[in-house]
């Protein structure tokens, strides 16, 4: 019931945003998107801490490198200094491309979480579903933003996800689950950073304060 209530609140928030989008200024829309991306990153950080609490001793050694994340092929700014030099249209495109690239991986994580060999798999499963809700909410909000910004901001890079299996043994499942979550945490941080830069520009804040 709590899960349904949370999802309903999020979707109602999106509906309200859709209905009133034409009356809301760009800076307010950016602020709302930034709040959602902040929550998304906060949840992913919490999930990584949960997974760290019960991780195989050799997990860090065996876990794939960050360069193996399926979104690593996307050319993005490496830090805030670079992001501040990127246009608004490109930043919103990058944020949407990264978010879209996680639809299938989040489905996989959601299906695997309930039987994950981890003592907190119930909490992990619940948080994964929250991630899906916030991801959809943020995606809907960004769709509204690009419609307000114009056609030049609507380009999306499609990033394929080929990993449909976490493995058969307990160690492989934990490591691959943790790896995917670490990739998501990294990308959620990028999405949040890009949207905060856009919010700063929309509110005409000084770039160095973004």
Swiss-Prot record:
Listed GO CC annotations: extracellular space
Compartmental location: Secreted
Listed Pfam families: Hormone_1
Keyword Secreted: yes
Segment forming the signal sequence: 1-23
Disulphide bonds in the chain: 69-183, 200-210
Protein's name in the database: Prolactin-2
Gene name tied to this protein: prl2
GO biological process: cell surface receptor signaling pathway via JAK-STAT; negative regulation of gene expression; positive regulation of gene expression; positive regulation of leukocyte proliferation; positive regulation of phagocytosis; positive regulation of reactive oxygen species biosynthetic process; positive regulation of receptor signaling pathway via JAK-STAT; positive regulation of respiratory burst
Highest taxon above the source species: Eukaryota
Main location (coarse class): secreted
MF annotations from Gene Ontology: hormone activity; prolactin receptor binding; superoxide-generating NADPH oxidase activator activity
């Amino acid at each position: 019931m709590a899960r349904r209530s949370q999802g309903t609140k999020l979707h109602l928030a999106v509906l309200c945003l859709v209905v009133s989008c034409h009356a809301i200024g760009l800076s307010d829309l950016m602020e709302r998107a930034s709040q959602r991306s902040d929550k998304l990153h906060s949840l992913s950080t919490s999930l990584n801490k949960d997974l760290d609490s019960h991780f195989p001793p050799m997990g860090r050694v065996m876990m794939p490198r960050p360069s193996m994340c399926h979104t690593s092929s996307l050319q993005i700014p490496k830090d805030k200094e670079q992001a501040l030099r990127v246009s608004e249209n490109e930043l919103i495109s990058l944020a949407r491309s990264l978010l879209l690239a996680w639809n299938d991986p989040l489905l996989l994580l959601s299906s695997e979480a309930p039987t994950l060999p981890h003592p907190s798999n119930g909490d992990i499963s619940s948080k994964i579903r929250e991630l899906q809700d916030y991801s959809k909410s943020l995606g809907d909000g960004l769709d509204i933003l690009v419609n307000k910004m114009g056609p030049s901001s609507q380009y999306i890079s499609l990033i394929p996800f080929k990993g449909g299996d976490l493995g058969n043994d307990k160690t492989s499942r934990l490591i691959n689950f943790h790896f995917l979550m670490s990739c998501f945490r990294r990308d959620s941080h990028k999405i949040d950073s890009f949207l905060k830069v856009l919010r700063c520009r929309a509110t005409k804040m000084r770039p160095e304060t973004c």
